[in-house]
C-alpha cells in the first residue's frame, strides 16, 4: 500500500509513525529538509519544497500512490490537494477553496457571519490602512475592548499580535497594523478582532466532506517561557487527559464547541464544496462559553503528537474514510490515557533563533524513559543533527494519569544537548490548577 506523505515536521513524523503501524504501508515522503525520524521509516524520499506543486506532481507520477496525506498548511494553500485529487489519488487534506478556513482569516470570519455560527466575535477586515481601521479600533477602545491584529493570510503562526501581550495598547495596535500593510505580512490584508479573555483549548476532527468525528480535547501552550510568559510561539507543548476532556472544560462547553465545528463543516460545504481532511479548532473558553479564535486546515502541532499515539483505530483506515467520505463506517477509538508533549526549541526562538547549530540527542535514554521522540525542524547532514531556527524536537509521555505522563516527558526532555531550551511546566499540576482557577474566576 503506497502512501505519499507531504511535509517534514514533527506533525508529519507523528502522521508517518501512525501510518506505519499498518505493516502494509510503504511510505513515500516529500519534504524540504532531512527529518531523521521520517527518513528512517520512509521507503523513498523526495527532497523538495512542500509548496513545489510540479515537484509533487512529478513524485506522485513516479511512485503512483494509492493514498496521499498532506501535513502542513502551505501545500494546501497552493492547491496540492486539488492536484492530487485530479490525478485520481484519494487525498487527505482539503482542496484550496475549503482550506481557506485557515489560509484566509477573512473567509473564516465572513463564513461565521453569513451562516450565523455560534462562537463568533466582533471583527472587521481591511485591505488598506486608513481612517476606517483607526475608527474601528477607537470604537473597540470606547467599549473597553482590547484588540488582536491578524494578517489575513498565512504567517506560520507568528503574525498575530495581541494587545496586552505583544502590543502595549490599542494605539500600538494601529502602529502594528500599518506595519503589516507596509511590509505585506501575510499577504497584506488585515483582520482586527476583539481580544477574547479566558482559557484556550483545541479540538480536532476527522472530516470526510460531510461527517466530522471528534478526537480528545487538548490544551496547547503557545507562550515561550514557564508560567505562560514571553512571546507567542507555534506551541511549546500540550497535554490531554484520560477522559478525553480537560480539567477546566465541562461536558456542556465541550458539546458547544463540537456543535460550532459541526456547523462550520456544513457551512464550508455549502459555500465552497466538501472539506476532506483534518480540522483543528482553536477555542477560547470565555465567560460566555467557547469562542473560536481560528481554524487550521490540518493537524495541530504539537497536538498531533498527543492524539495520534493513542489512536487505537487503524490510521490508514481512517485516512481512506476521510478521502472517500466513509467516516460513518469507522469505529473511532482512542486509548483512555493521558499524554504530555514538550518541545525543545532553539535559543532565541521565536524572535531571533540560533540556526545551523548541532543538536545531540540521546535516543536510547528517551526510549528508556518510555517516551516517544518526534523530530521537527531538524536537518541531518553527515550523520549529525542541526537545528534550523524553528522548533527542533518533541517528546511525549503517555500514562494512566497526567502526573505520570508529565514525569515521563520531563525525564525524556533532559536528553537533548545544544543551544536549545524548553518549558518544564507543561502538564504539571500547578499549571493545570491555574487554568481551573481562571475558569472559576470567569464564572463570577
From Swiss-Prot:
Q: Which residues form the ATP-grasp domain?
A: 109-324
Positions that bind ATP: 140-202
Q: Please give the Pfam families that the UniProt record associates with this protein.
A: GARS_A, GARS_C, GARS_N
Q: Which cofactor does it need?
A: Mg(2+); Mn(2+)
The answer on whether this UniProt entry bears the keyword Calcium reads no
User: Would you kindly state one Gene Ontology biological process term found in this protein's UniProt entry?
Assistant: purine nucleobase biosynthetic process
Q: Which GO terms describe its molecular function?
A: ATP binding; metal ion binding; phosphoribosylamine-glycine ligase activity
User: Which positions bind Mg(2+) 1?
Assistant: 282, 294
Reactions the enzyme catalyzes: 5-phospho-beta-D-ribosylamine + glycine + ATP = N(1)-(5-phospho-beta-D-ribosyl)glycinamide + ADP + phosphate + H(+)
Q: Where does Mg(2+) 2 bind?
A: 294, 296
Q: List the SMART domains.
A: GARS_A, GARS_C
Q: Which domain of life is it from?
A: Archaea
Q: Where does Mn(2+) 1 bind?
A: 282, 294
InterPro entries referenced in this protein's UniProt entry, alphabetically: ATP-grasp, ATP_grasp_subdomain_1, PreATP-grasp_dom_sf, PRibGlycinamid_synth_ATP-grasp, PRibGlycinamide_synth, PRibGlycinamide_synth_C-dom, PRibGlycinamide_synth_C_sf, PRibGlycinamide_synth_CS
Sorted alphabetically, which keywords does the UniProt record give? ATP-binding, Ligase, Magnesium, Manganese, Metal-binding, Nucleotide-binding, Purine biosynthesis
Documented EC number(s): 6.3.4.13
Entry similarity comment: Belongs to the GARS family.
Entries under PANTHER family matching the protein: PHOSPHORIBOSYLAMINE--GLYCINE LIGASE (PTHR43472), PHOSPHORIBOSYLAMINE--GLYCINE LIGASE, CHLOROPLASTIC (PTHR43472:SF1)
The protein, known as: Phosphoribosylamine--glycine ligase
Identify the coding gene: purD
